[in-house]
Every structure is written in C-alpha cells, then in structure tokens.
Amino acid sequence: AGYDTYPYYVEDVASKGLTVNKDFAAKIGDKDMSFTYVTEPTVDNDSGKTTTVLKFDLAGKSGQLVITYTAVVNKDIISAGNQVSNTAEVSRDNENWTPPVVFEAYTGEFAFHKYGVGADANGLAGVTFNVFEGSKAEGTPLKFVKLSDGEYRLAEADENGSSANVVSTTGNVFIKGLKSGEYTLKETGFVDGYAKNFVPTFTVKLTVSQEDGTSSVELIGTNNLGLASNVDKVIQVKNVKNITQLPLTGAMGTALFT
C-alpha cells in the first residue's frame, strides 16, 4: 500500500567561515521538488555554524533527491584554520537522524619576501603591490583586509576597511583566504631611491590540497626582469637601484633591447 504522506527531513549545518544563501533547491531527476523550511538558515552566535532544516513530502516519489544551495566563504575562515565544512543528516521524524555526511574544504595562502640592495638586502618595507586573479595584471585587483603588518586576507564583497594595496614589511608578507589558481602581483608603490623602471610583475600558481589544507606555490609565466624567485617555498622579490643590480637573466634581457 502507498503512503498518503511520506515526511522526509534534511538538516544541513555549515561551519563557521561560510555565509549560507537562502537559495536552496531540490530535484528528483529533472523534476523540481517542493519543500518547506522547518528552520531557515540560522547562525549560532557561539559556534558560528549555520543550521537549515528542510521538510519534504516524498509520497509517491522515487529516485535520488539532490539538494543544492550556495554559500560564500567569509572572513571567519581565517580563525577557523582556513577550513570550512558542511554536514548533512536526514530523518523521518525530525528527531532521529542518520549518521552525518561531512564535506570539508580549504582555502590557502602564499608568502612573498621583499628585499632590496645594500642595507635593504634582508628586507625592504613600504613597497605596495596589487594582486590580480589570473595570469595577467589586468582588470580590477583583488581587495584585502590587513590583519597585521605583513598579513592580509581576501576581503568579503564591499567589506569596510578593505583595500587593493598589499604593503611589504622587512619580513614575509602573507596573503590568505585564497582558492587554488593563478595570481599576478604587480608593484604599484615604490620606495625612494629605487628604480621605477625596473619593477617586478610576477605570476604564481597556488595549489591548495583539499585533503589536508596545505598550500604550495610556484612561479609561472610572467616574471618581469627575473626579479622574483622561489626560495624555500617563499617567493623572493627584489628591487634594484640601477641596471647593474638586476638578476643575470633580467640584466641580459634588458641589454638585448637597449
């Protein structure tokens, strides 16, 4: 005998670091499935987790139920260790739940070290960079929020206090909250005494492991005048005061065209 009703509940819990949009949708096969919100996306102020509970009536339905929604990584992912997770459980009565299914994802980071010549050979502070997504320094640069000197995270959309400027210190500069992909850094602000016609633009490829969250970075493609190099997993970026201080590859390349 068939059922007149067949209640089916789905609970979704998104971790701290995710902003859940109320755009849940469901299908069985190619047919849209209606549902009601038992609990609309609700953030727990203590844990930062967002819980949503949906109720379906699956009487007379068969097939795989697929539920989709979108979420945006937010600033809290940094304090959450660059990791977000999503947990789903199902129930017939909204009380007894199946063991949870957990999905985890990570964002990553990379570092670069800015240095000059002479007294600045160990670190050059005050140089400004813009960061562009992709293999070219074109379009609108990404915006960041400064966490501390030399530490920046990707800004949320329209976040107050965000800026496209990343400023070097005498130590490493860390750029956090990024997904895997290519990023191009272009020097846009200079330190007095250094040549403005010999400035670095370079592209890195960031790979974030979704197994353990580790980040790896390599130089690829664009590397103007050879001023960037990869040493001990940190991108080393040089500024010079004259052509004789360029790395050999950059000096040779410049000589060919002068």
Model-derived features with residue positions:
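Solvent-exposed loop/turn and edge beta-strand elements of beta-rich ligand-binding domains
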Residues: 1-258
